[in-house]
Amino acid sequence: MSPLTQDIEELPRAVAFIDGQNLIHDATREFGYDHLNIDVKKLALSVCETNRWKLTETRFYTGVPTLQQNPTWKQFWDKKLFQMRLDGVQTIASKLKDRETQIILYKHIRVTASDSSIESQTLIDTSPCWVTDRGYCLDHGTVISQTVFTEKGIDVSIAVDAMKYALESLYDVCLMFSRDSDLSPAVVEIKNIGIKSQSKFLVATVFPSSKGSDYGIPHADLTIRIPKSMYDKCLDSKDYFRRKL
């Protein structure tokens, strides 16, 4: 065994748990990108190489629309996830949930609830009012109905898998590519698992950021802010919106 090979094998093992939509939103806010245009495994490798960790697995979680919900994005995600799997990434995809949202754009609106136990009332506000999903009927004003597709359970899946990997001692470093505070209890539990098993796990919250003041997941041991220079080195040049790559 060469000294270089031995040195690599002795590096702390890292597993990347990537919240796809969280990563996209941060990249959009910070760098102006409107879709997932990077090689996620290359990004995880870049983070590990910078910190002298050995990446042993990359797991990517996202919600995917159906053909009926959005055929364009369905095609994109089918091709993108297929390429990830070819690259050795473990992909975990879930269906998006439909949610009907109604928005009213008037300041003075008489609102009558469908539930007769609630009396009619006049709302006076200086900002647009949101109509809840409990069946309110509007006597006046324009109502805009819109179906939005929401992602459910991604944070739970990441939390469960990250804790399972800790119990099985499959990593030394848990890389959570997310800033979702809902993952904070899982971070605490991973640390507790480490204490009970006499193992020391390092949990890092990783996200694109151009500002040093951005906060990641509470209770994480380390915050890693990905600068645009690192992000851009991991760009994926393939066009997954085309019918044929």
Task: Say what each PLM segment does.
Residues S2-V131, V143, T147, L202, ...:
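Domain-level signal for Mg2+-assisted phosphodiester chemistry and nucleotide/NA-binding surfaces
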Residues R99-L245:
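Nuclease catalytic cores that cleave nucleic-acid phosphodiester bonds
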